């Protein structure tokens, strides 16, 4: 059979696609495919994008990626990919890929903050970077410098960055963009369970009878999981029910049996309605054995503010009068009648204004009785909640009530398995921690948690927000394996593993990502290094942060693959190797860790982030950083140099020598059998002979630094419920769900039938039944009532118990009014990732969705004299941007709300959004603020 070149290529592509999903193809076509694939090397990897963690197969030829397909052996996606996954390799080959360091300079070749970007060598870049770092560090100490981290760090990158910052520079000012996406989930886990991350796994989808989405457009944000949900629904459509709760209609609603459109923030009231119905109307549905054996009731303060700036400081900085209208709610807020009713059991029923007295005690909580808990639920009758929560003005109240009742009935039905999924809708919320806690309330009361097919399940947004940001501990307060910097026992463990003198690690929590921005504006931080994120596009109320970057005496470094907004406002840009140009590992939403090998050489002079951190570490000696420091709050970090000398260190040793090139690290030899035939730029250099940070051709460290980082990191989790397998094992399997004990992973945590740690608690006689909530954090708490802790009662210990929280409904700090009459919600779309820095460079994805649109109800458009395709201004008290109107399509808001994605830097929606956060988690609420919209 003769084939033309065109037919040959088409046949090859068809054969490759067919084989990827296990279809048989004609022999002629198969032969053509094999001919086309001559010289290709296939290897397993993981997708670059969302927290689903899909496995992919990558084909390389002549040092370039030539094909990507779903990995049929990957248990997460079983050979499927979404549109981003299929084009994941193309993100590396955009026309404007950064290939050399760029420094703002004047015509004399000197650094000039007002100068233009000019190409420089790695040495020149690091010379200036070192100079500016030392300037800030020597002036302000460890609190004067910061790293913007990421939920897209590889595990080893995040570990190296955190170790450099916390063990080396003695600063806790490292915080990831995962603060924006998962912090409320984290706080909910820690406060409820005493340990982070979900109990369940993706297998729950195939095992459940009921899928409920709370603020999650899984069809676009976790499309492969949604494919599994769809398959489950279609497998038994009469039994399996799907309910979607959202503030607007989207693609996930197409599969739903019920769609509940609620008013922003009122998910708090809906959760409480379900809990009230259980306690007051269906007490027989309560699993009292579960509740009494494994739970305790608790509550905390409601008057905790909204995570905004101190209003007086905002006034000093010249915030506008309109902006201050909202900011003052951080100090006090007039309560609506609906809020008064919800807050009455907490002692605020007669208060017209809530004074935010407990801003600094937002996370404090105490045990209460069941009767007190029951009292907190009293306001949430069906009539009250329906009136408060109905989000679509065109839906009848009776229709909305009926949906709430059907939702409640699904949860309450005995024997029915229920999984509650959520993502940013619940997490990006000024009461996001409360919202997460309330999800567990319902599941705990019913005994439907930590069981196959039943549980409250927080879905991660980013590919390694779990595996790196959370597990590694790249947050301002964390160390690996759920340890925290303010716990002296945890610091001692870290200092032992890292071989540090006692007292090296700073005990003070650093600045979270929003506070880093505020500290730059305040002059408290003067050096910031951005890793694997785009915070100047991503952070709400961006006008302030642009000013802090460009108009103040701050030095901003951005390591990136492309020139996004953060790079454009920076002083120095460092070109980073992208995902398959380096070794790495990600951890997904079901605790599954997956590793990959370096597939190709980085482009241009781009270098891996690990190399950037370790090369920078070479420029600082112990005597520069381990001396005594007096911090702004009066804390004194001791001089640990004498102790370091006793440990065999010299004060002239570099941080690289001590942290990344000690005898332990050098024991991991390269070459290594696991990497046979593969590149390792950090270990051995590569064919480019890049002129490195020391001005010499880069030839590698000579040891397997990525493996060393992994093996040291996993020491933190061993025996502490965060056990990982050895490095080599992950290159032989399709990921493992931790804890990994005796070579076996754990599908369901806290369940003695599946979790070795829970099983051990039962064997030791610490629990009687099937569950053990063995997390240790926040397990000694006071006692009290709904109105506060009781100092006369002793604290109680809660081994192996979880908490059922009483949390009231409250409104957000900014709601629509006569001038700013519309809710604004932001989010993502299927085709683009986060700020679009990568996906907007992929021609196929760009053509599919070339710009961000303002999704609006047709009646709202008509009211404003605009139509589909018209350009409008979206304006808030903080800023404005322009976008084109869309009144049809995938997102269909109710009247009074618009949805604008944030992937398009030309539609800079974070100039408009409000930088209010959950006071407990410090996560920004991007889902609600008030705007006005008019024709441009």
Swiss-Prot record:
Matches recorded under Gene3D superfamilies: 2.40.40.20, 3.30.200.210, 3.40.50.740, ADC-like domains (2.20.25.90), Dimethylsulfoxide Reductase, domain 2 (3.40.228.10)
Amino acids binding substrate: 902
Cofactor note: Binds 1 [4Fe-4S] cluster.
The reaction(s) this protein catalyses: 2 Fe(II)-[cytochrome] + nitrate + 2 H(+) = 2 Fe(III)-[cytochrome] + nitrite + H2O
A GO-annotated cellular component: membrane
Superkingdom to which the source organism belongs: Bacteria
Top EC group: oxidoreductase
Domain 4Fe-4S Mo/W bis-MGD-type: 40-96
E.C. number: 1.9.6.1
Residues reported to bind [4Fe-4S] cluster: 47, 50, 54, 82
Residues of the signal peptide: 1-31
Molecular-function GO term, any one: iron ion binding
Chain positions recorded as Mo-bis(molybdopterin guanine dinucleotide) binding sites: 84, 152, 177, 181, 214-221, 246-250, 424, 428, 534, 559-560, 582, 609, 826-835, 910, 927
PTM (free text): Predicted to be exported by the Tat system. The position of the signal peptide cleavage has not been experimentally proven.
GO biological process, one term: Mo-molybdopterin cofactor biosynthetic process
Subcellular location: Periplasm
Co-factor(s): [4Fe-4S] cluster; Mo-bis(molybdopterin guanine dinucleotide)
Subunit structure, interactors included: Component of the periplasmic nitrate reductase NapAB complex composed of NapA and NapB.
Family, similarity comment: Belongs to the prokaryotic molybdopterin-containing oxidoreductase family. NasA/NapA/NarB subfamily.
UniProt function note: Catalytic subunit of the periplasmic nitrate reductase complex NapAB. Receives electrons from NapB and catalyzes the reduction of nitrate to nitrite.
Protein name: Periplasmic nitrate reductase
Species of the source: Nitratiruptor sp. (strain SB155-2)
């Amino acid at each position: 059979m003769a084939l033309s070149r065109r037919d040959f290529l088409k046949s090859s592509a068809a054969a490759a696609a067919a084989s990827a999903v296990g279809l048989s193809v004609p022999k002629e076509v198969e032969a053509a495919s094999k001919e086309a694939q001559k010289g290709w090397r296939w290897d397993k990897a993981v997708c670059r994008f969302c927290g689903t963690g899909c496995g992919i197969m990558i084909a390389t030829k002549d040092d370039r990626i030539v094909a990507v397909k779903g990995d049929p052996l990957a248990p997460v996606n079983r050979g499927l990919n979404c549109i981003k996954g299929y084009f994941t390799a193309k993100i590396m080959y955009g026309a404007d890929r950064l290939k050399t360091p760029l420094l703002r300079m004047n015509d004399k070749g000197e650094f000039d903050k007002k100068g233009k970007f000019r190409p420089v060598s790695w040495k020149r870049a690091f010379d200036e970077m070192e100079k500016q770092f030392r300037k800030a560090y020597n002036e302000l100490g460890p609190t004067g410098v910061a790293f913007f981290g990421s939920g897209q760090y590889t595990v080893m990158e995040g570990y190296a960055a955190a170790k450099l910052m916390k063990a080396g520079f003695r600063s806790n000012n490292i915080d990831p963009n995962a603060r924006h996406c998962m912090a409320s989930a984290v706080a909910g886990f820690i406060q409820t369970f005493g340990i982070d991350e979900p109990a369940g796994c993706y297998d729950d989808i195939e095992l459940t009878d009921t899928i409920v989405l709370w603020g999650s457009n899984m069809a676009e944000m976790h499309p492969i999981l949604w494919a599994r949900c769809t398959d489950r629904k279609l497998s038994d459509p009469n039994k399996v029910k799907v309910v979607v709760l959202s503030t607007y209609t989207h693609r996930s609603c197409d599969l739903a049996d019920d769609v509940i459109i609620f008013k922003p923030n009122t998910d708090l009231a809906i959760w409480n309605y379900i809990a009230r119905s259980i306690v007051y109307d269906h007490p027989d549905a309560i699993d009292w054995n579960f509740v009494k054996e494994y739970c305790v009731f608790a509550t905390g303060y409601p008057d905790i503010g909204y995570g905004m700036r101190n209003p007086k400081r905002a006034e000093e900085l010249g915030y506008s009068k309109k902006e201050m209208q909202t900011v003052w709610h951080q100090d006090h807020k007039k309560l609506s009648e609906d809020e008064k009713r919800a807050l009455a059991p907490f002692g605020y029923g007669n208060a017209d204004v809530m004074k935010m007295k407990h801003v600094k005690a937002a996370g404090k909580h105490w045990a209460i009785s069941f009767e007190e808990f029951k009292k907190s639920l009293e306001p949430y009758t069906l009539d009250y909640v329906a009136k408060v929560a109905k989000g679509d003005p065109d839906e009848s109240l009776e229709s909305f009530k009926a949906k709430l009742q059907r939702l409640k009935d699904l949860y309450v039905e005995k024997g029915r398995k229920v999984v509650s999924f959520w993502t940013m809708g619940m997490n990006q919320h000024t009461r996001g921690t409360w919202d997460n806690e309330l999800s567990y309330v319902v599941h705990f009361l019913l005994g439907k948690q930590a069981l196959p097919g039943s549980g409250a399940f927080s879905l991660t947004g980013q590919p390694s927000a779990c595996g790196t940001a959370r597990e590694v501990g790249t947050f301002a307060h964390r160390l690996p394996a759920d340890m925290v910097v303010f716990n002296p026992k945890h610091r001692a463990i870290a200092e032992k593993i890292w071989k540090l003198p006692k007292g090296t690690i700073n005990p003070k929590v650093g600045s979270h990502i929003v506070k880093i921005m505020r500290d730059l504006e305040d002059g408290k931080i003067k050096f910031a290094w951005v890793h694997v994120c785009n915070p100047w596009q991503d952070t709400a109320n961006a006008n302030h942060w642009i000013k802090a970057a460009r108009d103040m005496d701050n030095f901003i470094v951005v390591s990136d693959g492309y020139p996004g907004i953060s790079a454009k406002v920076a002083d120095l840009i460092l070109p980073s190797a992208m995902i398959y140009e380096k070794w790495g590992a990600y951890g997904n939403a079901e605790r599954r860790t997956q590793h990959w090998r370096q597939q190709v050489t980085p482009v241009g002079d781009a270098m891996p982030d690990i190399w950037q951190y370790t090369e920078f570490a070479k420029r600082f000696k112990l005597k520069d950083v381990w001396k005594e420091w007096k911090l702004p709050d009066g804390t004194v970090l001791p001089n640990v140099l004498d102790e370091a000398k006793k440990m065999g260190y010299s004060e002239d040793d570099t941080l690289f020598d001590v942290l990344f090139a000690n005898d332990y690290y050098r024991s991991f030899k390269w070459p290594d059998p696991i990497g046979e035939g593969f590149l390792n730029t950090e270990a051995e250099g590569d064919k480019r002979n890049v002129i490195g940070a020391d001005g010499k051709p880069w030839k590698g460290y000579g040891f397997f630094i990525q493996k060393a980082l992994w093996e040291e990191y996993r020491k933190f989790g061993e025996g502490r419920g965060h056990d990982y397998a050895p490095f080599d094992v992950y290159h032989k399997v399709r990921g493992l769900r931790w804890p990994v004990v005796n070579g076996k992973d754990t599908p369901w945590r806290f369940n003695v039938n599946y979790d070795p740690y829970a099983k051990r608690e039962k064997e030791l006689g610490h629990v009687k039944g099937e569950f053990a909530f063995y997390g240790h954090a926040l397990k000694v708490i006071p006692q009290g009532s709904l109105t506060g802790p009781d100092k006369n009662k002793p604290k109680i210990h809660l081994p192996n118990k979880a908490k059922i929280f009483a949390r009231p409904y409250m409104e957000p700090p900014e709601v629509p009014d006569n001038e700013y009459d519309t809710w604004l919600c932001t989010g993502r779309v299927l085709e683009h990732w986060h700020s679009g820095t990568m996906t907007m460079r992929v021609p196929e994805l760009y053509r599919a969705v070339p710009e961000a649109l303002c999704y609006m109800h047709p009646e709202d458009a008509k009211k404003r004299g605009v139509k589909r395709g018209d350009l409008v201004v979206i304006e808030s008290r903080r800023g404005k941007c322009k976008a084109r109107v869309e009144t049809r399509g995938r997102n269909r808001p109710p009247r009074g709300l618009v949805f604008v994605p944030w992937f398009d830097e030309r539609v800079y929606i974070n100039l408009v959004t409000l930088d209010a956060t959950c006071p407990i988690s410090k996560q920004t609420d991007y889902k609600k603020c008030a705007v006005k919209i008019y024709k441009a």
